[in-house]
Amino acid sequence: MPRRSATMLAATLLLIALLCVSVLMKVPYTEMSPGPTYNTLGNQGGKPVISISGRDSYPTTGHLNMTTVQVTGAKYEPSLVNAVVGWLRDDVLVVPHDNVYPKGQSDADAKKQNAEEFASSEDSARTAALKQLGVPVGSELIVKSVTAGAPAEGKLHAGDQIVAVDGAPVTTVDQVVAAVTRHKPGEPVVFTVVPRVKDAAGNGAADPGARTDVPVPTVRAKDLDPKAPAERAELAVVGIGTGIRHTYPFQIDIGLQDVGGPSAGLMFSLGIIDKLTPGGDLTGGKFVAGTGTIDDDGKVGPIGGISMKLIAARDAGAEYFFTPSSNCAEATKNIPSGLNLIKTDTLDGALKSLEQIRSGQTSALPSCAK
């Protein structure tokens, strides 16, 4: 075979081999793309996204859309060629797998975490909105989680309100920890709880709202968690996580299924305020979308996947987009045409921006582009 032909054949075979490798070789990346948006003032599946009972609510117009991203699963790994194609597209974000799914996390683990973050976000959204409106918000100490196989399993349940430990009233997490750890491992601790309504009514163990004393044996911390720090390893534990649950003078339900994560907090707060404000009509009929976590005091925090959320908002028809200040640098790298990015740090600031949008005085809006 002539040398030239042999060289061309070798080059062709090498190219084919490289193409095969690029198609078959998997790389540790995750792909994000624009997800659906939901109008917090509207309906989803025939039901209001935000429904209020026990208090007057008022008609609204326009849109206050929360935005989402779609993410490939924990087990998915794109081929090298698919990852390269994703890097070249504006509507796909390719990120290291561990940035989205910590090592060892399964789809079920991720779904559970996202659901917990979403529930926490809903709670903070209600709290921040009512504080903004001057409505009193209460709090109570609850069981947040029960460790599988722990002494508390089957005795205490997530959602139970903790009223006292060993007969002494408790109102903080630290008080519960102190009351349990003063025992020697093996000794019982008596929790006075108000069982969560679902368990109390369903099991017939107690009337909803009734107090009951629940004795729970203790074990050493290291018996439940071999990785417990040395200073805690020998302390008595029962295997629960505790936290604070807010209480409200009326019912605010957020009815979205199959949505997770904490990033809708700001938009939920705005939707709640709009529905509770007589004649408020925060948007003035405009299409506003946005994202951002929110804490109980109305502070807005950063989120992931901002570039994909901007595309989702633009495709849905949004004209304005609330953007957490910490996300502005990334967001301004590729702003979709016709979308105005409003820099946002607080719920109060977002409300002031809506007032400017409603009045048409948009030139002074705090913009990410400035």
Residue ranges and their predicted role:
Residues 5-26:
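Hydrophobic membrane-insertion alpha-helices, especially the h-region
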Residues 31-60, 67-73, 91-147, 222-291:
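PDZ/PDZ-like peptide-tail recognition elements
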Residues 130, 152, 159-162, 191, ...:
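Terminal peptide-recognition signature
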Residues 148, 167, 196, 294, ...:
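Short, ordered loop/turn segments at secondary-structure junctions
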Residues 152-174, 194, 310, 317-323:
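Conserved PDZ fold ligand-binding element
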Residues 178-234, 333-359, 364-370:
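PDZ-domain C-terminal substructure recognizer with occasional recognition of PDZ-binding tails
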Residues 262, 275-278, 282, 288, ...:
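Glycine- and Gly-Pro-enriched alpha-helical subdomains that act as flexible
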Residues 300-323, 332-337, 341-352, 356:
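C-terminal soluble interaction/assembly domains
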